[in-house]
């Protein structure tokens, strides 16, 4: 019988909030409870509001005086304070292992002999110059960001990533030994995924229903998705586009584009609305300009939605080209996106194959049980290694 692992789950965010890290913080905790052992959640921190307020103030001051960006989530001061907070939380308790998702502002200065497994969807080096918020940074923010990342990896018995893109950066940019990295795709953040039958029931109709999910119209490529909608009409395909999670800029409208600015998945009504939208759509379309992973692709796969996505960042870690989706180059415009969509929508066999492959991808690799099983095995490996070294 496998011994239960006592896991300290360390996170700045609230693990009970389904919105934290797009739902990933909550989902990982539940998966580890099912497959690894006893999970004790030690977050969130009690000074997060103060940190956010001070970060916004410093960011505004930096931009006003230097034109540069301050990275509030990469502060040596707050990293030390976070470490002290979690040291107090760990004191007097018995744990076998620390699991720390998105914790490069906790782990660097944490004083503990408990082995750490960290998880992130990117490194600081991968983010710098890739996301707008990580461009034109203050020299002090760059220095702090790289130091925190390096310290986190040094303290991690294993660093888990959802994509080869992120893992390669840890190895290339910070010298992390490859054998101490692991690549496990993250699951779909769905409390009640649809059954296979429900996901595969929808047939191709006369109208191509496109769905875009994202909070940032510009970064998610909303303009390209709208152009694709217009180009589909020129190709003779009746189509609609439903945008969920953000608002287009003022004046950006189309009679066949609907906008749902926000869905609260913490509430049953919100989860039902989200479910209905995915069940009634034909394709997920996300011409993202920058992306570390993309839970939405896993969620789309659960509903049998073939995803059209940009070949950038960590997206290939969740969208396998020709399997559960199609990857288009960053340079592709609305016409190229429309042609790719039209090719699959116009062919019954291709359409149904895409739905089947998407659902299979969810069942085989893009669900939290698959992630939890692999991560639990990794935890047992780490504990066995430490036991053989006499460090436990």
Indicate residue ranges for each PLM-predicted region:
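Short hydrophobic beta-strand element within catalytic cores of glycosyltransferases
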Residues: 306-310, 319
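A short, well-ordered alpha-helix in the C-terminal region of glycosyltransferases
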Residues: 350-365, 374
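Nucleotide-activated donor-binding/catalytic signature segment of Leloir-type glycosyltransferases, i.e.
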Residues: 245-283
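Membrane-proximal helix-turn-helix segments that form the acceptor-binding/catalytic region
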Residues: 138-159
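Conserved donor-binding/catalytic core segment of Leloir-type glycosyltransferases
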Residues: 160, 197-220, 226-230, 241
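Aromatic "clamp/platform" in nucleotide-sugar-dependent glycosyltransferases that forms part
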Residues: 289
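Carbohydrate-associated surface elements
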Residues: 165, 187
């Amino acid at each position: 019988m496998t011994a239960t692992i006592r896991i300290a789950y360390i996170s700045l965010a609230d693990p009970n909030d389904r919105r934290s890290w797009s739902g990933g913080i909550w989902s990982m905790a539940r998966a580890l409870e099912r497959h690894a052992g006893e999970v004790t959640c030690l977050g969130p921190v009690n000074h997060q509001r103060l940190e956010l307020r001070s970060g916004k103030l410093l960011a505004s001051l930096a931009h006003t005086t230097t034109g540069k960006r301050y990275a509030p989530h990469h502060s040596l001061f707050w990293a030390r304070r976070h470490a002290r907070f979690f040291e107090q939380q760990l004191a007097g308790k018995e744990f076998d292992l620390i699991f720390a998702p998105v914790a490069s502002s906790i782990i660097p200065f944490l004083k503990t002999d408990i082995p750490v497994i960290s998880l992130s969807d990117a490194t600081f080096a991968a983010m710098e110059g890739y996301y707008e918020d990580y461009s034109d940074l203050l020299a002090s923010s760059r220095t702090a960001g790289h130091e925190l990342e390096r310290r986190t990896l040094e303290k991690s018995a294993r660093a888990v990533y959802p994509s080869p893109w992120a893992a390669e950066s840890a190895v290339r940019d910070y010298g992390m030994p490859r054998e101490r990295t692991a690549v496990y795709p993250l699951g779909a953040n769905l409390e009640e995924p649809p059954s296979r039958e429900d996901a595969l029931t929808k047939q191709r109709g006369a109208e191509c229903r496109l769905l875009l999910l994202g909070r940032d119209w510009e970064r998610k490529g909303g303009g390209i998705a709208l152009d694709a909608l217009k180009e589909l009409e020129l190709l003779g395909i009746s189509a609609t586009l439903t945008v969920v999670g953000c608002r287009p800029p003022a004046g950006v409208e189309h009679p066949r584009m609907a906008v749902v600015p926000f869905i609260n998945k913490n509430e049953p009504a919100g989860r039902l609305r989200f479910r209905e939208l995915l069940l009634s759509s034909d394709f997920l379309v996300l011409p993202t300009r920058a992306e570390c992973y993309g839970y939405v692709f896993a969620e789309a796969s659960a509903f049998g939605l073939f995803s059209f996505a940009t070949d950038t960042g960590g997206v290939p870690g969740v969208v396998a080209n020709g399997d559960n989706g199609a990857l288009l180059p960053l340079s592709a415009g609305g016409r190229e996106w429309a042609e790719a969509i039209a090719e699959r929508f116009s062919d019954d066999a291709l359409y149904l194959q895409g739905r089947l492959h998407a659902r299979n991808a969810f069942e085989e690799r893009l669900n939290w049980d698959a992630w939890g099983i692999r991560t639990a095995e990794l935890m047992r490996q780490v504990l066995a290694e430490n036991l053989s070294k006499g460090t436990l």
